[in-house]
Amino acid sequence: MEQYLINLIDRMLDDSDQNMVAGYDGSKTISWKATREAEKLTEEKYVEQIIEFIEKEKNKKKRNKAYFVLYKIAKNIDNLKATKFLIKRIENETDKYILMSMLDGIAELNKSEETDLTNIIKATENEKWQMRHSAIGALKNTSSVIAENQILKILQNTEDKFNIIYSISSLYNIGTEKSIPILEKYLASRTRDIKSGAENAINEIRKRK
């Protein structure tokens, strides 16, 4: 991997200037500036290099930052190879915080209809609620029927308030007319976020007709 990327990841992990004292400004730290730098990357040549780095790197903190760099590049240039790699890597990681970060990043990426979403689908059924919610969000930005069907399945089998809220949010983004009957059931909800979320999702779906 190019020295620039190695240096960037090292700077993202650098906490040497993070002194939690009065007047401390986190936006001036080495890691904060490096993270903002990573968010702007658009070089396609970095994709393969970062993929190779992740596959070999044993240090999970470095892998975590490399994932961040990769999904920012994938978002900025709509790189499907990077997106598919990130989804595939869900099955390789075990740290829930890394997985949540990956899933939250994947949520922002365009996923073509033929993209294999199996690992995301499995994560929506995880026993850890943080993982479930991030995975439900990761089903956004796709036209896949499988994604919509999984979210509808979740709604048909849950009473958990937050499962419902996250599912409705994803349907706002990807739902079709077949989601409307299920969403309409939540219009009578006494929970404001559920009721308003369902209203907004139905309206957004109808705009897409």
For the regions a language model picked out, list residue spans one by one:
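Short inter-helical turns and helix N-cap capping residues of alpha-solenoid HEAT/ARM repeat scaffolds
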Residues: 27, 58-59, 94-95, 127-128, ...
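Amphipathic alpha-helical scaffolding segments comprising HEAT/armadillo-like alpha-solenoid repeats
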Residues: 1-19, 41-55, 76-91, 111-125, ...
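Structural detector for internal amphipathic alpha-helices that build alpha-solenoid repeat scaffolds
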Residues: 21-42, 64-77, 97-112, 130-144, ...
